[in-house]
UniProtKB/Swiss-Prot annotation:
PROSITE patterns tied to this protein: PAL_HISTIDASE
One Pfam family, short name: Lyase_aromatic
GO CC terms: cytoplasm
Name this polypeptide is given: Histidine ammonia-lyase
Designated gene of the protein: hutH
Keyword Ribosomal protein part of the UniProt annotation: no
Gene3D superfamilies, alphabetized: Fumarase/aspartase (Central domain), Fumarase/aspartase (N-terminal domain)
């Protein structure tokens, strides 16, 4: 299946399919005429006498140096090779595929001036599985993601490296094995390919998709913990959240209420319970998780706009002029990444407190210490809770805003930058930590519910426990725990736990 992209209106749902499923993509042929028109205009400018940045001049601080017509192709090649300055491990294939798809969307708007053959090469590389090797570090998020995108482009011109069928090869070899030929870049094409926010945006989108799946699962594990602790569902009453009015809070409260519907555990203490209120980690879930959901949705709106944006420079305007601007500055992406980081941090923080509550016999309302069946002889989930605390603390450190840390570069020509790229890249580690925290809460909550037998939980939560137990057996006595934690985190990450919940209960990203 090939996804047909309509530049300017590609929805988040499609972008997530590209990220998760690695499907090939093509630009809707209806956009080809506009692409070719802009390319023809760039060719006219390159043949003329007037200096235009990036077409017949140097770059950055060297923009005042005029380039002879005969050197334009060399200029573009030199640009790519000199900007291949990335360091660190290669970005994963699914991230690079998303970067390439986003670059297609941007170029497909017909304001960049690249020839159609450049676009068709990217499409063919995605279809045949030629994935450029892009090091993870080296971008400050303005002027675009220069170093990462230069590595992408290097493979297109037969330089650099690329992965093909599991092999890491030279760019030329990878293209050759796939039956493709490198492109010779014409005027402005190198600049159009490397000057853009696609790396930062792809990383931020990946973080968003992972964070949203984790957020949905955290509502499930939060409901499990509530039932395991014999907590009250009264704070989830619809009217409470309507009176405040925040959409995320309303949606989170509704989800928690529905997940707990029909629980025999809850019915057992409706009357005669001497506890007046639950701790905040139980009672305030809608307020905390709902606020996180709201900012994830806000970040989603920003990133959907950016994914459809033209972010190189200069741009070919509708009147035919090539005009320099600053769309390459990734400040919106940096802010979105910082928002996602805050949400990831807080979802993990309140989840960790519920884990701590359930393993503490002074708080868990009758559950054994650390949920061990023979406390003392067995330590139960004692150190699983400690691990969740370590991961929570690590995420707190990584949640510091990246967008506030500008520094001047390129001889002060590029004197304010966004730091969007590493701000977005940290989300991969943060969401991995969050998946592990929520996985530990799933283990804790499920075991707590099982220890309430013969009382039973709701039908929805019973499905979650069954999905967990298909991979992780109930803890009867101490055993090697690392495999349990790994399996539980994977069930969060791959959507297994959220996937068993009936449609319409868990909140969507687009609301």
């Amino acid at each position: 299946m090939t996804i047909i992209l309509k530049p300017g209106s590609v929805p988040l749902e499609t972008l997530e399919k590209i990220y998760r499923e690695g499907l090939p993509v093509r630009i809707d042929p209806a956009f080809h005429a506009g692409i070719e028109k802009a390319a023809a205009r760039i060719a006219e400018i390159a043949a003329g006498d007037a200096p235009v940045y990036g077409i017949n001049t140097g770059f950055g601080k060297l923009a005042s140096i005029r380039i002879a017509a005969g050197d334009v192709a060399t200029l573009q090649r030199n640009l790519i090779l000199s900007h291949c300055c990335g360091v660190g491990e290669p970005l994963s294939e699914n991230i690079v595929r998303l970067i390439m798809a986003l670059k297609l969307v941007s170029l497909g708007r017909g304001a960049s001036g690249v020839r159609l053959e450049v676009i068709t090469l990217i499409e063919a590389m995605l279809e045949k599985g030629v994935i450029p090797m892009i090091p993870e570090k080296g971008s400050v998020g303005a002027s675009g993601d220069l170093a990462p995108l230069a590595h992408m482009t290097a493979a297109m011109i037969g330089e650099g490296e690329a992965f093909y069928r599991g092999e890491r090869l030279s760019g030329a070899k990878a293209l050759g094995k796939a039956g493709l030929k490198p492109v010779v870049l014409a005027a402005k094409e190198g600049l159009a390919l490397i000057n853009g926010t696609q790396t930062s945006t792809a990383l931020a989108l990946a973080g968003l998709f992972r964070a949203h799946r984790a957020a949905r699962t955290a509502l499930i594990t939060g409901a499990l913990s509530t039932d395991a602790a014999m907590g009250s569902d009264a704070p989830f009453h619809e009217e409470i959240h309507q009176l405040r009015g925040h959409k995320g809070q309303i949606d989170a409260g509704r989800a928690l209420r529905t997940l707990l519907e029909g629980s025999a555990i809850r019915r057992s203490h409706l009357e005669g319970d001497q506890r007046v209120q639950d701790p905040y980690c139980i009672r305030c879930q809608p307020q905390v998780d709902g606020a996180c959901l709201d900012i994830l949705r806000q970040a989603a709106r920003t990133l959907e706009i950016e994914a459809n944006a033209v972010t190189d420079n200069p741009l070919v305007l509708s009147d035919g002029r090539a005009v320099s601007g600053g769309n390459f500055h990734a400040e919106p992406v940096a802010f979105a990444a910082d928002q996602i980081a805050l949400a990831v941090c807080e979802i993990g923080a309140i989840s960790q407190r519920r884990i701590a509550l359930l393993v503490d016999p002074s708080l868990s309302f009758g559950l054994p210490a650390f949920l061990a069946r023979k406390p003392g002889l067995n330590s139960g989930l004692m150190i699983a809770e400690v691990t969740s605390a370590a991961l929570m603390s690590e995420n707190k450190q990584m949640a510091h805003p990246a967008s506030v840390d500008s520094t001047p570069t390129s001889a002060n020509q590029e004197d304010h930058v966004s730091m969007a790229c590493h701000g977005a890249r940290r989300l991969l580690q943060m969401t991995a930590n969050l998946n592990a925290i929520i996985g530990i809460e799933a283990l804790t909550g499920a075991l707590g519910v099982e220890l309430r037998k013969p009382l039973t939980t709701s039908a929805e939560l019973a499905k979650v426990i069954a999905a967990l137990r298909a991979k992780v057996a109930t803890l009867e006595e101490d055993r090697y725990m690392a495999d349990d934690l790994k399996a539980a985190a994977e069930l969060v990450a791959d959507g297994t736990l959220s996937g068993v919940i009936s449609a319409g209960i868990l909140p969507d990203l687009e609301a």
